[in-house]
A protein has these predicted regions:
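Nucleotide/pyrophosphate-binding catalytic subdomain
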Residues: 1-189
Length: 189
């Protein structure tokens, strides 16, 4: 069995300060994932950025509430994001597949087993799964706190030996890093 790694990339890593997708950074990420695959790793990418990409794509004609914004911008942005990933990975002849999931898919049962089987079939056939929460239909109270949580669940589900979180946060903290009493945890085992 190949070594398995989950890479999570956050919106702040994927976007420039003006809110547009950072194609240069995404290209560098794709280069590194292609290298990992050449070293006999199975890679699963958990990618944020759909809402940001959608927000950049469309200015709405009326004020939207937070749920409407998330639904509209994620629907638009997911297509844009996957299109860019498709173009970048195609340069390495790497096929990608989209996996949109919800928190309920991680409860024991058929949905959990089906989701795991889907990603195993993709990996067995050389397809790189790109995972994100299905923000267009997820219910606010039942959503992941963020894709850090989602990537941890994916890593556990897929029995990954490594989880890499690419973020603009300086590490793992005891509390929200914006809290002045939060302390950096120097090592997680």
């Amino acid at each position: 069995m190949k070594r398995r790694i989950v890479v999570k990339v956050g919106s702040n890593v994927l976007t420039r300060t003006d809110g547009k997708l950072d194609v240069t950074r995404m290209s560098a990420l794709v280069d590194q994932i292609a290298w990992l695959r050449s070293q006999d790793y199975d890679v699963i990418l958990v990618s944020s950025g759909a809402v940001s990409a959608g927000r950049d794509e469309l200015r709405t004609g009326r004020e939207l509430d937070s749920v409407e914004q998330r639904q509209l911008f994620s629907a638009l942005g997911q297509v844009k994001l996957m299109g860019l990933y498709y173009d970048l990975f195609r340069e390495y002849d790497i096929h990608i597949g989209q996996v949109l999931t919800m928190k309920k898919n991680f409860e024991p049962g058929d949905e959990y087993a089906n989701q795991r089987q889907c990603m195993n079939v993709m990996l067995d056939n050389g397809v790189l799964p790109i995972v994100n929460e299905n923000d267009t239909v997820s219910i606010t109270g039942l959503m992941f706190t963020d894709n850090d949580e989602l990537s941890g669940l994916i890593a556990q589900m897929m029995q990954a030996e490594t989880l890499v979180l690419l973020s603009n946060i300086d590490g793992v903290f005891t509390k929200n890093p914006n809290d002045p009493t939060a302390e950096l945890i120097p090592e997680v085992q």
